[in-house]
Amino acid sequence: MWFNSVKDTKMKKNLKKWVLLLVAAIALPVTTMAQEKKVELGVNLDVTMDVVSSYIWRGQKLGNACLQTTVGVAYKGFSLSAWSPIVFDGNDNDEIDLTLAYETGNFSVSLTDYWMTEIGDEHTLEAQLGYDFGVVGVNWYTNVYGDDKEYASYISLIAPFSLIGLDWEAEVGATPWGTDYYGTDKFSVCDLSLGASKEFNIGSWFSTTLFAKATYNPTAEKFYGTVGISF
């Protein structure tokens, strides 16, 4: 009975992920053709599909090569999006991230539901506060609900710049206190990253972006390299 219950749950979760992918596949050509013509009501539909060589998140490797799909809708600063990876080697962690966000000026706030069936509680809610100072963007994240009882937090500083025709991002990420969620026992820098990207326009209605990123986790003493393409 327990095995059947787990199997049914995973089947339902996988179905939801494939439905998300199908919606993205259908909506992608619609959104690309409508990029030059804004919807009069001010509602914007955003669909992206990234193929990446590995799934790296905040200095941790969570998976191998995968397709990462995002479907979102935005209206007057508010946005709602769904994100999910489909790992090519079949070692899927059954993840769907649902994010409700609001942006005004340089300030942003959001609440993300990390929905994973294989890690304790299926849902972990994370609150985010951020401010973009121009030369650097600062974001603070804290788990406010779920299996994590330590209010695991993470702070990220991202500095964007342009050089030799590429768009770059330098990032520093750290945990302000120890938590099993990030595998740290004190204040720890766990993400030193440098990424570059280049957008290519194909005609007047479609564009794609190639990107690469190098990540070093000083706490775990691990290095990761990622390349990918975004549609």
Residue ranges and their predicted role:
Residues 1-44:
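Cleavable N-terminal export/targeting peptides
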Residues 35-88:
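Short glycine/proline- and aromatic-enriched beta-strand/turn motifs that initiate or cap beta-hairpins
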Residues 46-52, 72, 81-85, 101, ...:
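Transmembrane beta-strands of outer-membrane beta-barrel proteins
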Residues 57-65, 86-95, 115-124, 143-153, ...:
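Solvent-exposed loop/turn segments connecting transmembrane beta-strands
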Residues 97-146, 156-161:
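Gram-negative (and chloroplast) outer-membrane scaffold detector with strong preference
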Residues 194, 200, 218-231:
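Outer-membrane beta-barrel "beta-signal"
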